[in-house]
């Protein structure tokens, strides 16, 4: 269905993962907890749900609402969305900025007009202090409360889950986490911003 890249394309840079110090794992009758000095992830044994706590500021930026689902439609994650929470990212989503209450496609529609997706990126960030990047080129859909208010539903046409969750309070910090994985974008010289491209927005 999709052409194969030769050599295979990669999302991650070669030195994507930072060393993490002070990782601890503990367990009780109800939960398995993985923590670092800055972040705590709590997995509920019975339900399979999890939440992520930011130990730096005592907040819970991320909470799952259902187990990870694997089916014929791919892999799906479902998170809680708050009333005062906003979502950004997904690459070039023409005509869209904040995705709250909307659904976006993570697939190249080769459409440069309003509603098109010209250069998708499997990454978004939330004003609650977290970001998610899927390590896949497969098509995806991210629903930020269009079908059901208060719920974020993320899906990719993939038969496994490979995603990074970043926890940081400020957008710049979350973007730096993203760049740690993918590499920093290149700043073009002034002559690279050619005037002819302006016709795409008339």
Question: Can you annotate each of these PLM segments?
Answer:
Residues 202:
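Short, acidic/polar
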Residues 1-192, 196-198:
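N-terminal accessory segment at the very beginning of proteins
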